[in-house]
Amino acid sequence: MSRLTIITKDKAQVTMESLYQDLERRIVASPPGLCTIDLTRSFIKMCLAQSCGKCVPCRVGLRQLARLFDDVLDGNATEETLDVIRLTAEGIYYSADCAIGYEAAKLVLKCIDGCEDDFRSHMERGFCSCNSNQPVACVKSCPAGVDIPGYIALVHEGRYADAVRLIRRDNPMPTTCAYICEHPCENRCKRTLIDAPVNIRGLKKMAVDNAGDVPVPACNEPTGKKVAIIGGGPGGLSAAYYLALMGHKVTIFEQRKQLGGMLRYGIPNYRLPRKKLDAEINAILSTGIEVKKNISVGTDITLEDINKEYNAVYISIGAHADKKIGIDGEDATTGVTSAVEMLRAIGDDEMPDYTGKRVVVIGGGNVAMDVARSSVRLGAEKVSIVYRRRKADMTALPEEVEGAEAEGCDVLELMSPVRIEKDENDAAVGLWVQPQMISRIKGGRPSPKTAAKDEVLIPCDLIVVAIGQGIETRYFEEHGFTVKRGTIEALDTSEIKERKGIFAGGDCVTGPATVIRAIAAGKVAAANIDEYLGYHHEITSDVEIPYAGYEDKVPCGRVEVALRDAADRKKDFEPIEYGFSCEEACQESGRCLRCDHFGFGSFRGGREKQW
């Protein structure tokens, strides 16, 4: 008789693992607008199925919670029911033996604290209001609310110009977003239920690269109203575009010599080609927008002067101030610079020469990756990225980190900068770092703490600090604007309290964010400025979206955007991505499930909010 046997998976185990994978995909693809109470009940029942049954709080308590949630969803609950749910969850949380019990209870407590209105809706009206407002997941996830299923259907038919026209209804910078958008729309794509999310950004790139010159829509009749935009970045350009289409006279005041903001002075050409950016900006300006460059508000002109001449003002200054890391030696005469300073020089075509230099980049965001990859292209002999957390904790997009590593950059994770080593000429010659270890999770991210290891010296010729950007708000604060944590305080309508006719949005309100969020802020501001001026213009599109017919959506692999070989692309600043072929675009666009016609989204045409 054998003492041991090799464990092999039986049919039931294989089936269970397949079910787990299906469940994981379904959770990832959960659309916005779901009933939180119903979702929590489902989670409780799943936890109950996982329970071993040995401890009473888990075995009995979870079953009791499931029954109480059934009462809420059936409209049979009262205030007393809510109290019992809380007490039961607290009892499980503090007495369950393992995470199956107390993590389930923790979720219930979180649901009660954050969704009290949903509970009351079920108790008082017998239904959840969110069930009647469940939009298309990708449209809801896009900050600008672009009709994504619509333009994917147009790409599928090869109607690229129409796709661009449809995108412009909600986003005046389709080319920019086709190249560098963080594509949050893909995160909740319902196609994940079958295999993988649709490559939405890749399809948008297919449209803009093949559409040719697409004229902007005709502007409405002039209203006689004048609007000033302070800042010519993506947010300011977005607001200016829509306001001009509405018939208002728009003037942009730009501090630098060229428009584009961080698109020009923060995004290298290999990610966003300058020719593409210039063409997109020129298309926006073709609506009749006036531009005044090299004008700094507060120095060359005052806000009071602008306010007197214009009927409304939109402040959309970006995050162009660098942040100091605050360590000894950062004041070195040479060898230390900021990401903002470096990328700004590149944006002005003033390319620094890093030939043969050892460069250390401090930071873990997209800007840090841009700096590192640009340093390689500028001739650096060695590029090291220093980050105090793990690589998995970096805020940079995974593809950016992978791209940096493929181009030869070293990622030194769990290394916290301590001080900068200087020579007798006050030049930086190295960075001292302290090894870290991951500790408790705070605010959703693990916190690093000092490891019991010696400090390490990283020899280098240049240190680039890329730990974030700040907003230059001093002038506005001195003129009575409320500034909290370095940002201007504004309402969600972009209005400034007690400052009639002045609006603000984008990075100067939210802090440094993504391009699509700045564009969305400009769109919101334009609509509310238009209303403030006494109008209610709507931006429409006469593009006819193809009919969504029934078809069998079988599993099909996702088509990825191909990249130039790392060994070649790191030698220049030329674009690194190839576009889809017609065959690839047709296959990938055919994977779209058309949630604007099938599912809850069909009740609202796929759009949560109209202009």
Predicted regions and their residues:
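Redox cofactor-anchoring modules in respiratory/redox and cofactor-processing assemblies
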Residues: 1-130
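Local cysteine-cluster metal-coordination motifs and their immediate loop/turn environment
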Residues: 45-67, 90-107, 131-150, 172-193, ...
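Glycine-rich dinucleotide-binding loop and its adjacent helix/turn
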Residues: 206-220, 282-299, 322-378, 483-499
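Feature captures the FAD/FMN-dependent oxidoreductase FAD-binding
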Residues: 221, 226-228, 278-327, 419-432, ...
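N-terminal Rossmann-like FAD-binding beta1-loop-alpha1 element of flavoenzymes
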Residues: 226-249, 368-376
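Rossmann-like dinucleotide-binding cores of NAD(P)H-dependent redox enzymes
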Residues: 252, 256-287, 291, 346, ...
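FAD-site-proximal beta/loop scaffold in flavoenzymes
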Residues: 334-356, 424, 441-512, 553
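A conserved FAD-binding loop/helix module that cradles the flavin
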Residues: 508-539
